[in-house]
Amino acid sequence: MRILKSHPLLKLVNSYLIDASQPSNISYLWNFGSLLLLCLIIQIITGVTLAMHYSPNVLEAFNSIEHIMRDVNNGWLVRYLHSNTASAFFFLVYLHIGRGMYYGSYRAPRTLVWAIGTVILIVMIVTAFLGYVLPYGQMSLWGATVITNLVSAIPWIGQDIVEFIWGGFSVNNATLNRFFALHYLLPFILVALVLMHLIALHDTAGSSNPLGISGNYDRITFAPYYLFKDLITIFIFIFVLSSFVFFMSNVLGDSENYIMANPMQTPAAIVPEWYLLPFYAILRSIPNKLLGVIAMFAAILAIMLLPITDLGRSKGLQFRPLSKFAFWVFVVNFLILMKLGACHVETPFIELGQLSTALYFGHFIIIVPIISLIENTLVDLNTMSKG
């Protein structure tokens, strides 16, 4: 045990994973961190393995994926692990963010942790988009064309930037090469950001807790208590992920991507992966191209407003019934946006998308501050009546 506290590197591991004191009342909703770390490890291992057999060339990319599936030993397993863990990664990240919103994890002194987490989400979205292009099926090509074309909405220089990204006048060999290089690089940047996220959490106030009060009254060490608690959810996660990988490998994908990319034939509907659909729905709900792009990016950055707009006196929504109701309305609205992102651009989906987009932004800018002020006033009135 002594070496864990004296060795310069093991000392860090000890302070984060063994002796780190945690509030004694944190629930299973605080287990997402370990699950997300497991997802990142799986993604890097499977991604590097896939990169050994992948060819970033427009003529060979699709066939190299088929080669991985058919000829490489357990290549099908590595590929399906990579694609399904990507979905699991985003699913858990959304739950992690939702838990943070519900329990007020964005409030001081954890604002820096929240800000770094938002940057992690942005890097994840970019990485996922780049990875979706690499198989070079129909949805890969047209998804890349549509999303990169959004940059052309920037006044004056937009089209030049798009051609710079493409390395030509359309998605071509240069595009695929640079997307592959960036997709390989970004997960390692993600690792650095995750370490920053952990350091910011560890060096401020540590984990919050379901009551929203100081956790200093009763704390226990991370090992063995929370280590074993994390292992329970890790085993459940492995079981669920395995059921997807082995029995429902393509249920979260798009069948269009099993058709080789054809620049001469547009798919019936161009949709991204399910985890990017809410932001895609926001993009499509605004007719103006530039405003749509701004709204899409603003939708991701909107969670950064919470430390400013939440004016409530108590941390978290556990004892704030109005805020709790508003939060669940927001969750349902987010799921509606996800569904609308996969629908065709036609009535009534356009109007529903516009309403949902207005409600999405309204939650952060109007609903959260107004409800928190109403709750503060009700608490004050109750205190005065009792006084």
UniProtKB/Swiss-Prot annotation:
Family annotation (Pfam families): Cytochrom_B_C (PF00032), Cytochrome_B (PF00033)
GO biological process, alphabetically ordered: mitochondrial electron transport, ubiquinol to cytochrome c
Keyword Lipoprotein among UniProt keywords: no
Residues that bind heme b b562: 82, 183
GO cellular component: mitochondrial inner membrane; respiratory chain complex III
Ligand binding (a ubiquinone): 202
Gene3D superfamilies linked: Cytochrome Bc1 Complex, Chain C
Keyword Electron transport tagged: yes
Binding site for heme b b566: 96, 197
TM segment ranges: 32-52, 76-98, 113-133, 179-199, 226-246, 290-310, 322-342, 349-369
Quaternary structure, from the entry: Fungal cytochrome b-c1 complex contains 10 subunits; 3 respiratory subunits, 2 core proteins and 5 low-molecular weight proteins. Cytochrome b-c1 complex is a homodimer.
Remaining remarks: Heme 1 (or BL or b562) is low-potential and absorbs at about 562 nm, and heme 2 (or BH or b566) is high-potential and absorbs at about 566 nm.
Family membership noted in the UniProt record: Belongs to the cytochrome b family.
Function: Component of the ubiquinol-cytochrome c reductase complex (complex III or cytochrome b-c1 complex) that is part of the mitochondrial respiratory chain. The b-c1 complex mediates electron transfer from ubiquinol to cytochrome c. Contributes to the generation of a proton gradient across the mitochondrial membrane that is then used for ATP synthesis.
This protein's name: Cytochrome b
